[in-house]
């Protein structure tokens, strides 16, 4: 060190024992800006890209960092790694210049005149950020005039994101697009089958989709070989019998050659209609409604003093956050059970009067078909039951315990839609009512409840294997409870709320606690408690959350209209849209419903608005 720069004060042995890291947040931006300045002035550029006899200078390091294509070219011993000039084939000067400019500036200007060139270049050079920007731009430009061209573009470059967006666009505009000459002439059989098989396809009724299929098949003679592939996506069983025979069969026979065997689908649908009671176990992809599943509540006791039972079946309209009536029950019920099997809603047992002591118990079983919005009465249970549990498992229903005019029950019986009959199976080890149950991986679990004996409610957890017809004890809950709710979500079984009796006074009190059971570990864990009491509530799992509907508080002697929603990931309860009335003894389920025409129109309009179309 020069004498003039020597310190006058000697440096201490240590300034500080602590260290601090300093960060320059704009460092990468500043470096990129200086590199761009060097490029524009021709400084330190070690490669010149040549396309269409025009040159684009650049730095190899930057190209290799941003592009897998150039990284391979410059590191795998290719001759271009040692060339000053590298000629590119399969791209354009407009596209190359825009992409290289983006690598240096982080800015990309897209418009209708350059999008094709830039997408071509970015795809060739494997610069996926630019490809994503191109897809985002094109998504905003999709219209009824260009969707076929953009769909082909997505196919050429394997743009799954753009392709999925266009599919969604076509589905939401299907009734308009599907009868146009461009669609009928140009759409591929693969795409047509995707649209006709979708539950989201816009249509007024199934016959419109059949007409599209028939018109597409008859556009060109060589399409005849695709007849079965196309028609198997039409849901023939959704047609009423008279429409099947009078319109559908006639249209098939008049437009398709006999060797196409289109009548086989009509015969299959007629067999389905003729097997009315067995329909829940005759389900195929062609019997499913083209709609999303809805959360419903069914029946219940509407008030404490007015002796009023409900016959409402309502679903939650998530768009408007309100409950909408789907249908009326054949008979008013409370403390009944509901299960869904094969897309049909079954309502079993329950009380047909305000007297819920078992004297008004019913053994009736009704079935609701959302496809036709129709109730039918099927075989009654062998025993009248109220305050019991009903499960759907494989191709049957299982009714467990409960009580009636003779007292608490231990019997268990199963219903087969194939035979329309109930059969007794292995009973519970003890009389049980006021319990709760759920299905987990084809096993029936029930917990808690009472048996008419004096004393508190139970902690027991029982598991039933229908294959061996055996009940087994599992680790009991940490909290005794009855009139509670159970459900399965993910790998856990939840036991929720309910009530219990004090040992000394025998006064009833509310249980707000919730616990989760792991069948793998045979262990219970406490989770977030309820927001309010919920004895005799409806419960369902919908869209990955637990819904508790209504209920009763023994401490405040009040019915509830609250909907409590549990998020297992956040371990938190929140409030959902209130029920129309305060209600207890209500059941809940999740099932696909046949949307009304005005709802279909509104749903499709909302989808278009969500996409900014």
Swiss-Prot record:
Pathway listed for it is: Protein modification; protein ubiquitination
Tell me which UniProt keywords the record has, alphabetically. Answer: Kelch repeat, Repeat, Ubl conjugation pathway
Top-level taxon of the source organism: Eukaryota
The coiled-coil regions, if any, are none
Q: Which PROSITE patterns match?
A: BTB
Output the Gene Ontology terms for molecular function.
cullin family protein binding
Q: Does the keyword Repeat apply?
A: yes
- The chain positions of domain BTB read 45-112
Q: Which SMART domains does the entry link to?
A: BACK, BTB, Kelch
* Repressor among keywords: no
Function field: Probable substrate-specific adapter of an E3 ubiquitin-protein ligase complex which mediates the ubiquitination and subsequent proteasomal degradation of target proteins.
Q: How does it assemble?
A: Interacts with CUL3.
What is the name of this protein?
Kelch-like protein 36
Upper lineage is: Eukaryota, Metazoa, Chordata, Craniata, Vertebrata
């Amino acid at each position: 060190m020069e004498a003039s720069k020597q310190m006058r004060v000697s440096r201490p042995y240590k300034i500080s024992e602590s260290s601090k890291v300093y960060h320059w947040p704009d460092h990468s931006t500043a470096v990129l800006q200086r590199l761009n300045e060097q490029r524009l002035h021709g400084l330190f550029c070690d490669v010149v890209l040549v396309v269409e006899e025009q040159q684009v200078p650049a730095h190899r390091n930057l190209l290799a960092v941003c592009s897998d294509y150039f990284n391979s070219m410059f590191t795998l011993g290719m001759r271009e790694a040692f060339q000053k000039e590298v000629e590119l084939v399969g791209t354009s000067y407009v596209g190359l210049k825009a992409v290289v400019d983006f690598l240096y500036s982080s800015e990309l200007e897209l418009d209708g005149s350059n999008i094709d060139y830039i997408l071509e270049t970015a795809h060739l050079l494997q610069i996926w950020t630019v490809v994503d920007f191109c897809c985002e731009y094109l998504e905003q430009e999709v219209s009824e005039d260009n969707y076929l061209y953009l769909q082909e573009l997505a196919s050429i470059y394997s743009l799954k994101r753009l392709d999925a967006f266009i599919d969604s666009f076509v589905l939401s505009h299907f009734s308009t697009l599907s009868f146009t000459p461009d669609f009928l002439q140009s759409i591929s059989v693969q795409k047509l089958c995707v649209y006709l098989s979708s539950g989201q396809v816009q249509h007024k009724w199934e016959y419109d989709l059949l007409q599209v299929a028939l018109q597409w098949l008859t556009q060109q003679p060589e399409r005849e070989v695709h007849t079965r592939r196309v028609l198997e996506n039409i849901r023939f069983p959704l047609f009423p019998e008279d429409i099947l025979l009078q319109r559908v069969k006639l249209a098939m026979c008049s437009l398709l050659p006999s060797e196409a065997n289109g009548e086989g689908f009509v015969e299959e649908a007629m067999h389905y209609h003729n097997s009315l009671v067995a329909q829940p176990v005759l389900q195929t992809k062609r019997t499913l409604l083209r709609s999303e599943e809805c959360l419903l509540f069914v029946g219940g006791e509407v008030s404490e003093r007015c002796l009023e039972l409900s016959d409402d079946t309502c679903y939650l309209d998530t768009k408007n956050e309100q409950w909408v009536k789907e249908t009326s029950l054949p008979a008013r019920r409370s403390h009944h059970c509901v299960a869904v099997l094969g897309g049909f809603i079954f309502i079993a047992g329950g009380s047909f009067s305000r007297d819920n002591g078992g004297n008004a118990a019913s053994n009736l079983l009704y079935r609701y078909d959302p496809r036709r919005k129709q109730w039918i009465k099927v075989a009654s249970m062998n025993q009248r039951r109220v305050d019991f549990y009903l499960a759907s498992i494989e191709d049957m229903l299982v009714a467990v315990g409960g009580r009636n005019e003779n007292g608490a029950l231990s019997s268990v019986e199963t219903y087969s839609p194939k035979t329309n009959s109930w059969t007794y199976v292995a009973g519970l080890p003890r009389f049980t009512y006021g319990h709760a149950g759920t299905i987990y991986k084809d096993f029936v679990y029930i917990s808690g409840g009472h048996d008419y004996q004096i004393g508190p409610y139970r902690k027991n957890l029982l598991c039933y294997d229908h294959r061996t017809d055996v009940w087994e004890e599992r680790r009991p809950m940490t909290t005794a409870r009855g009139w509670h709710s159970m459900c399965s979500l993910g790998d856990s079984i939840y036991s929720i709320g309910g009530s219990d009796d004090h040992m000394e006074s025998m006064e009833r009190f509310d249980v707000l606690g919730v616990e989760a059971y792991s069948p793998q570990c045979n262990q219970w864990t406490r989770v977030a408690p309820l927001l309010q009491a919920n004895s005799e509530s409806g419960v369902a799992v919908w869209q990955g959350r637990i819904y508790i509907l209504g209920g009763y508080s023994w401490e405040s002697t009040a019915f509830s209209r609250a909907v409590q929603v549990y998020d297992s990931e956040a371990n938190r309860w929140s409030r959902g849209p209130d029920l129309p009335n305060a209600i207890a003894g209500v059941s809940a389920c999740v099932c696909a419903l046949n949307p009304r025409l005005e709802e279909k129109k509104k749903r499709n309009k909302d989808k278009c608005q969500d996409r900014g179309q």
